[in-house]
Amino acid sequence: DFFRYLNYKIEWKDSLIGIKGPKGCGKTTMLLQHIKETFLGNDLDKVLYISLDNLYFASHDILDVVEAHYNNGGTHIFIDEIHYYEKWQTLLKNISDDFPGLNIVYTGSSMLQIQAGEGDLSRRQAMYEMRGLSFREFLQFEQGIKQDAVELEDLLHNHIGIAMNICSQTAILPLFKRYLKYGYYPFYKDVHNGIDIRLQAVVNQIIENDYAKIDDVNISTIRKTKKMLMVLSERVPQQPNMSSLYRELETDRNQGLKMLYALQRGGLLLLLGDNVKSSDNLSRPDKIYVNNPTLMYALSPYAEIGTVRETFFFNQLSEAHECRYPKA
């Protein structure tokens, strides 16, 4: 079976675990795999998996469900789509306080909402972030080729040997082209040729649902944010003329930067600047990218291959490194 990289990094014995990341990156699948591998058999009655996007919780109190599970010997609870619960942070505190010994794992599809409230839980929880498939994971997912993660230092000094080792196992270039086109999101195997439509639905949900909830933005801002994403997707990577962009969107600098960084936190854009902490101050980025090549192709089917490769490199490197834009 194929397991995501994050599955092996999580300390599953911790009492409170949060997993955040963009919609479609595979968080739910990872939870269900862990439950199957860990509890299948005599211990299955000790674990409860619930998803808060289920309509059941529109008229039922989740704390009643947790209490019933706990009183019947439950030791673990997995809460998916936590951001659908309006006061999710209070909910997690109450569960943690009221049910001692209960192990809690929760996920949120929107990085926006998880980030907005994680400060008060920071002392209690272990927080992890999941991203889309790396090319290394894609090779294993697609053809069963297992390759250890390559450190940047090793890549810089031994790239020829690393490349020869991988190329000896398969014809790598056709696979790389397929990865760039549709391989970043694990659900590509389920949708076949409909990945563009699926990704457009993901984008709409992030902007219309997640962004609207966290910042309580109105319909006009949602429309402008969608337009911003589409305008930028046709021009990236670029050193943006933000004043011109704001005029085109009929917005001001303050709102424009809020929309821009919301798109970044939602996993739709990558922003590159000379200061890695610039997002705290909402400063103008030096360069803007669509988050990953697969999303780039979905938003702009005729993306230039050099731009696609540059986006791939930035996306992969930023997983474990701070990327900065060099100043002259």
PLM region spans:
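Structural recognition of the conserved hydrophobic beta-strand(s) that form the central parallel beta-sheet
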Residues: F78, N103-S109, E129
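Pre-Walker A adenine-sensing motif
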Residues: D1-W12
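Short glycine-rich substrate-engagement loop in P-loop NTPases that contacts/grips substrate
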Residues: L44-G73
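Conserved lysine of the Walker
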Residues: K27-T28
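Walker A (P-loop) phosphate-binding loop of P-loop NTPases
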Residues: K23-G24
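Hydrophobic anchor at the beta1->P-loop junction of P-loop NTPases
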Residues: I19
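Accessory nucleic acid-recognition modules appended to NTPase machines
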Residues: K189-A328
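Interdomain motor-coupling "hinge/lid" segment immediately C-terminal to the ATP-binding subdomain
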Residues: G117-L229, S233
